[in-house]
């Protein structure tokens, strides 16, 4: 038993819970049982882990995760935020923790897993040099301005609440975390991501709703990004 894992929780918010049984099966298989799981929006429990089930009263991604993260940080100094539509591999958790230890003196904000359904350099399809069927870059930790925390670890000190929107909430949060003096990193860890199972596949709707909020509340950022 690793006593340090008793001070760590995996935090999930869900609306439909379509993929939650598979995620929980992978947590049960690959995550030490000392880690607590906190899920908002479902009564489903992991079979091997202490599971705390909460309501999900948020109207969007930002509100839903803010609520459950605040709850978790009342008990835990650091948490792993997980999307409800990912699947862990045998090394997802272990590599994330190993990389966090390696970066312990780097003013760590987000440290997030790579995936097959994610934008930018966090996607495993990015790379220049092959090593067998993988890219060499997949075995490297690197810094990034903006990340998608599909499976990412963060401390209570570094956390900043999401804006109350679906799209762009993680972009804005990452920028604010960097402005507060922390650095965001991509881990060597990998998770499979189904994608868009909670916010839906109507990309135009998600884009328009987020842009409307940003324009009304963060006009300078709106003009920088979208004008």
Which residues does each predicted region cover?
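Short, acidic, metal-binding catalytic loop of nucleotide-sugar glycosyltransferases
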Residues: 25-34
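Glycine-rich, basic loop-to-helix element that forms the pyrophosphate-binding segment
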Residues: 56-72
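Short beta-strand-to-loop acidic/aromatic patch adjacent to the donor-nucleotide binding site
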Residues: 76-87
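Conserved donor-nucleotide/metal-binding helix-loop-beta segment in metal-dependent transferases, i.e.
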Residues: 93-107
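Short beta-strand-to-loop element that shapes/binds the nucleotide-sugar donor at the catalytic cleft/hinge
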Residues: 106-124
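A recurrent flexible, glycine/aromatic-enriched loop bordering the glycosyltransferase active site
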Residues: 132-154
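A short, conserved alpha-helix in the catalytic core of glycosyltransferases
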Residues: 146-147, 151-152, 158, 165-190
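Active-site donor/metal-binding and catalytic loop motifs
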Residues: 185-208
């Amino acid at each position: 038993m690793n006593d340090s894992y008793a001070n760590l929780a995996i935090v999930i918010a869900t609306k439909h819970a379509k993929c939650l049984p598979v995620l929980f099966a992978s947590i049960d298989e690959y995550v030490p049982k000392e880690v607590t799981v906190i899920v908002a929006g479902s009564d489903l429990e992991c079979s091997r882990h202490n599971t705390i089930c909460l309501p999900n009263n948020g109207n969007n991604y930002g509100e839903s995760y803010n609520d459950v993260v605040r709850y978790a940080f009342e008990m835990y100094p650091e948490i792993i935020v997980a999307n409800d539509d990912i699947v862990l591999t045998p090394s997802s958790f272990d590599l994330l923790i190993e990389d966090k230890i390696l970066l312990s003196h780097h003013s760590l904000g987000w440290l997030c897993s790579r995936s097959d359904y994610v934008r930018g350099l966090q996607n495993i399809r990015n790379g220049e040099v092959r090593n067998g069927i993988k890219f060499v870059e997949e075995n490297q930790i690197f810094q990034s301005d903006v990340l998608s925390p599909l499976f990412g670890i963060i401390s209570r000190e570094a956390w900043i609440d999401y804006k109350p929107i679906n799209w762009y909430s993680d972009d804005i949060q990452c920028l604010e975390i960097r402005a507060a003096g922390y650095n965001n990193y991509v881990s060597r860890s990998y998770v499979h991501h189904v994608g868009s199972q909670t916010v839906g596949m109507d990309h135009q709707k998600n884009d328009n709703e987020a842009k409307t909020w940003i324009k009304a509340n963060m006009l300078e950022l709106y003009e920088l990004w979208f004008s």
